[in-house]
Amino acid sequence: MKKVYRSAARMSTLLLFAAVAQMSMAQNTNTKDKSNSKEENNRNVMLNAASANGPREIQIGLPSADVNVLENGLPVTYATNPHGVNANWRSDASLSRVGLLKISETAITTGNIGYAVNSFTQLGQEGFHGQLQYKTNHFGLNEMSLNLNGGMGKGWYYSANMYQDFDPGTFELKSAEMQDRTQIYKLALTKRYNEGRGEMTLMGRYSKSHPVYTYATQSAPFIYVGDGSVQEYGKFALGTTSYLPTDPSMTYRDMRTGELRTTTMYDAAENNSKEIALYNTYNWDNGLSWKAALRYDNARGAFVYQTPMSLINLPGSKHGYIQQDAMGNWTPYTGDYVQTRMSCLNAGDIDELLFTSELSKRFSQSTLRLGLNQWYYHIDYASNTTMYDQSVPVDGSYPVRLVDSKARNSYFYDFNKNASEYYKGHENKLALYVTHDWDISPKFNLYYGARLEWQQLKGENAAVRNASGYVGRFADYHLGAVAPDGTRIVPTKLDYDWINYDFTAAATYKLNKQMGFTADFTYIVQHPRFENFSPATLPNTDKIVVPLGRAGVYYNNPWMSLTSLVSFISKTNNNSTLNLQHNSEIMAAPLTYDIQTLGWTTDVVARPVKGLEVHALLTLQKPTYKKYETSITFSDGYVGQINATGNIVAEVPQVIIEFDPSYQLTRSLRLWTSFRYFGKTYANINEAYYFNGRWETFGGLNWQVNPRLSLGCTVVNFLNQTGAKGSIAGAELITKDQAAGIKNVLMTGSYLRPFTVEISASLKI
């Protein structure tokens, strides 16, 4: 389970329905074009303000879960912790198409919640073809991908792909050369059947990735002014200054064996994957079509986090913090602040075998589809955590590690005390789904479907109980350790069988050629996934219910398409863990809560004059916590309590605006911009701290030099906005009354991606 170190259980940072797509385009087209009816349009999937190389995460007002990315009908990774999508997939020259599946289609075909990036591998074609893509930026990024494909005769085709990423990030690290070093290789061999009846493809993939950015860009210090704005701390420039110590080494206690080990953060973050897949499609003359996809993946997934915890304002010189100088001598630390950090070394060995099969039949006015998922996932996972202290340099120099000589004689302490995790075993999902897309009349279309899923989970974790309840974590916690009360930490057996189900229905009525009504409803019933069993407690295993309803109108004319929808979504039994902080003590508090969001979205695409296209979206929403209560008793007897029921969900804005104009200057030159406004967001669960609204801006020029060569220039954050976003470290227990008098105080949190100029080129061979 992705651990929650900040407020709101790592809540989605965007909206309820900023991702409500321009449905009117699908509604005024021929409903027999079913390839588009399952996908959303105008979502700029790869235009990402948070990452230079990953897909944009389109949120729906619920806690952040797995990022759904499919390739050839199968999830790129079964679970994204510890094996992230970016470690095994990039939107590069190896893909023939990238789209976005609707929430209803994602729910029925995968059982997951939210939109899904839908991608397809570039397979071989007749003759010889190739594409070379290259991207760089003014910070020194070098990203390239190459696809070569062609025919081999007698219906056989090949496709070979290579992806390389050398990304130093937006500031120089001393502990690693690159913030992202990723390499992905694919090889596909295709046999096409006679008379265009289909094809069979055998594909292999190897990937290796070091996502250093997951910990290098996680936090930075800033001055919280008190009015929702922040100021930079001294010469520490947000986004272009490193907040990591120069020493890359990390000492930790192995959760499985209890041994003390040393590694580097770069090595701990290594992901690798070796997979083989088989895809088949076959079409009969009677409108019957069969698709099947089978993939086996053997992988090591890993994430490293360097989470800021306490920020200590030192009382003059009466402290025991010391640092080592260049000669190895220990000297008193003379800075004003000390940052305590928790290192989380998440890693797991993974084997997954995924199979999906679909049989569809086209009739004169409808398409019927029957599908099967058989997904098996085995993992041996542990998260080893350790604490250390570092300086907070006001001059923008690199932080150094510190030792509190009054408490210890080494850098690292509290091994596995705060957020260590362990689980081992397998999860299996066997599901049957059916959909029917029916043009009842020229004016009325009805789409409906259902999914029935058997989820089996077997294995073990470290949720150990004593007479008083769960033992929980403690310093030097690991399998085989003995708690202060004498309880031995031994694996707890897990064995669950659940029935999950989803159903969806969508109706579109065309009042006339220009205007109509649309409504859809999706109801999802799930149970916890294996990663929810990672903490030292068992999660709430009651069913998780997600109802989603939308209704609205659309209007189309030759120069404009408009859709306006009201929406409702909720989710019960969100399992989460908060790391609550009191003085210098940090304790984990598990909780289960509900969320509910009401929203209204209007989406417009207009072409008022030749060459000009404008896309605009406005979302107003109210995401609120329901039954959000927890408490924890610290060692000094203080009881930390949180009751956020009725509060606005942290990190989620109530106002979203998107404005995307583009203009075709000539037949070969296109100028475009993209503006996204995110309104005021709360930076902790109690609505005590907040950040003012912010703009994310992009702009660029695309030049089609000739049919083979295209060039592009993109500017990220061209308004050069700097500041903080997300949540504030260690602020979970702060109330509104306590925060009222807090002004011009140093805090740590996440920040905006800095001004970046990117140059790209694509050459068709």
Q: Where in this protein do the model-derived segments appear?
A:
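Repeated loop/turn-to-beta-strand initiation elements of outer-membrane beta-barrel proteins
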Residues: 129, 155-158, 195-200, 287-290, ...
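Transmembrane beta-barrel wall of Gram-negative outer-membrane proteins
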Residues: 129, 136-166, 171-243, 276-279, ...
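Extracytoplasmic beta-strand/coil segments of soluble accessory domains associated
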Residues: 29-75, 102
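Acidic/polar loop-and-plug regions of large Gram-negative outer-membrane beta-barrel proteins
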Residues: 190, 199-277, 302-344, 398-418, ...
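Short acidic/polar hinge/loop motifs at secondary-structure boundaries
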Residues: 57, 74-102
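Structural signature of Gram-negative outer-membrane beta-barrels, strongest in the C-terminal barrel
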Residues: 348-352, 362-377, 382-386, 390-408, ...
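Gram-negative outer-membrane beta-barrel transporters
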Residues: 442, 559-561, 565-575, 588-685, ...
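C-terminal beta-signal and adjacent terminal beta-strands/loops
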Residues: 27-29, 677-682, 703-765
